[in-house]
């Protein structure tokens, strides 16, 4: 498809790349690319390479004394490449639809409280208040998990080809991003997985995102009364 324009966040990267390519050194680039391929693959190769790679990048450069257990590294890797698939399983067990409904009600009530507070401000002009109310009207709360999970059906995974799986998931992720070029902005997209214990406010989209991972005790508990939940996650959001 023909794309007339794109947003480039770091134009200097492309000008610098152009200068490098103008003096193209094929053997040098080949060596550089081979090194990056080997370095990027090292954490997924044999035990000796994994440990040697960690000794330099983990301990020498970052000061991390010990390599994490293999199963923990495996979980992190799978979560990184299949995050929403893992998230769908997580919310089925830890965040039922009732929890999402109750959280949406909580956020709605907080927004209504903002309206009351803004209306009572004597230092804010009517025009400014109108803009504030307009922002509240357009505010988007994303709670727990996306309404539609990402479709991974086109991704082929083999149980006996780790490096091949890494390559396949990398390509899948890149294709997903490239497909956005020239397409309308997907305002329903999440930039955190449901199982993530964190949250964020995106001012550009005027949205808050609270994944199911952080909507657990002590912040939020479906079995607790409103006082506990408004004093917990309500205080964080407000």
Each model region followed by its residue ranges:
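Noncatalytic, helix-rich "gating/capping" subdomain that lines the substrate-entry/channel surface
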Residues: 1-105, 109
